[in-house]
């Protein structure tokens, strides 16, 4: 068992029953010229987040934790995004940006596109699981819950972008499904102003989970090495 110093209190977990979740570390969300950047969101401070996720993934993999990578997006025709009858059609900033700038149609969050791809620095390895998701929450219309339950996983450690959208949405849904969620705050980044990051972390540590950081996470895992049993 590993005890992780966190807010509002420490949390103890078995790395063999824990997954590291990497949320949407795609060019769309972390790279200049990607969807968030084109939609007017600041992505200039995402590089340290990428480096911190690399560190967290390395430590988690060495401890035998399952690594799950999410990619948010839809088919090239955007059928999966939903039409005017879906609130996603009206609220997705990617879809709204493409309607405002028709030359971007088919380029934002479309499967197979550069925008959809994970950033170059973050490469899934054999044994990792890569899951597409069509909405903010990684539990909606994906096999995530089945994958976790079949492996006896109850604790989820979250990294990725955006803290206040897909990270928080997935952690909240996990809370409702009886998963224990931890966010590594310096391995996440908000979509929007800095107060959005602070508000999301406040919500998580107060109502839905725990908040820690990458150095503390790595230190907690470093005392013992683990080997995942297939």
From Swiss-Prot:
Pfam families to which the protein is assigned, alphabetical: Isochorismatase
Catalytic residues, chain numbering: 24 (proton acceptor), 133, 166 (nucleophile)
Induction: Up-regulated by the nitrogen regulatory protein C (NtrC also called GlnG) and repressed by RutR.
Catalytic activity: (Z)-3-ureidoacrylate + H2O + H(+) = (Z)-3-aminoacrylate + NH4(+) + CO2; (Z)-3-ureidoacrylate + H2O = (Z)-3-aminoacrylate + carbamate + H(+); (Z)-2-methylureidoacrylate + H2O + H(+) = (Z)-2-methylaminoacrylate + NH4(+) + CO2
Top enzyme category: hydrolase
Molecular-function GO terms, alphabetical: hydrolase activity, acting on carbon-nitrogen (but not peptide) bonds, in linear amides
Gene3D superfamilies assigned to the protein according to its UniProt record, in alphabetical order: Isochorismatase-like (3.40.50.850)
EC id: 3.5.1.110
UniProt record similarity statement: Belongs to the isochorismatase family. RutB subfamily.
Role of this protein: Hydrolyzes ureidoacrylate to form aminoacrylate and carbamate. The carbamate hydrolyzes spontaneously, thereby releasing one of the nitrogen atoms of the pyrimidine ring as ammonia and one of its carbon atoms as CO2.
Identification of the protein by name: Ureidoacrylate amidohydrolase RutB
GO biological process: nitrogen utilization; uracil catabolic process
HAMAP family xref list: RutB (MF_00830)
Keyword terms: Hydrolase
The keyword Hydrolase belongs to this UniProt entry's keyword annotation: yes
């Amino acid at each position: 068992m590993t005890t992780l110093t966190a807010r509002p209190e420490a949390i103890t977990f078995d790395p063999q029953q824990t997954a590291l979740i990497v949320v949407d570390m795609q060019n769309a969300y972390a790279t200049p010229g990607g969807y968030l950047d084109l939609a007017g969101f600041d992505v200039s401070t995402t590089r340290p987040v990428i480096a911190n996720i690399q560190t967290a993934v390395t430590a988690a993999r060495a401890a035998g934790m399952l690594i799950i990578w999410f990619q948010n997006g839809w088919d090239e025709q955007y059928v999966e995004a939903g039409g005017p009858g879906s609130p996603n059609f009206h609220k997705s900033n990617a879809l709204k940006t493409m309607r405002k700038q028709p030359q971007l149609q088919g380029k934002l969050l479309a499967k197979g596109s550069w925008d959809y791809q994970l950033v170059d620095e973050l490469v899934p390895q054999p044994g990792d699981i890569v899951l597409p998701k069509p909405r903010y929450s990684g539990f909606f219309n994906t096999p995530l819950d089945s994958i976790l339950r079949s492996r006896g996983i109850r604790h989820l450690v979250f990294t990725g972008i955006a803290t206040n959208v897909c990270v928080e949405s997935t952690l909240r849904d996990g809370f409702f499904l009886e998963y224990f969620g931890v966010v590594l705050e310096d391995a996440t980044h908000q979509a929007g102003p800095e107060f959005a990051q602070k508000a999301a972390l406040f919500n998580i540590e107060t109502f839905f989970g725990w908040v820690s950081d990458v150095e503390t996470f790595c230190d907690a895992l470093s005392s013992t090495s683990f080997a995942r049993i297939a």
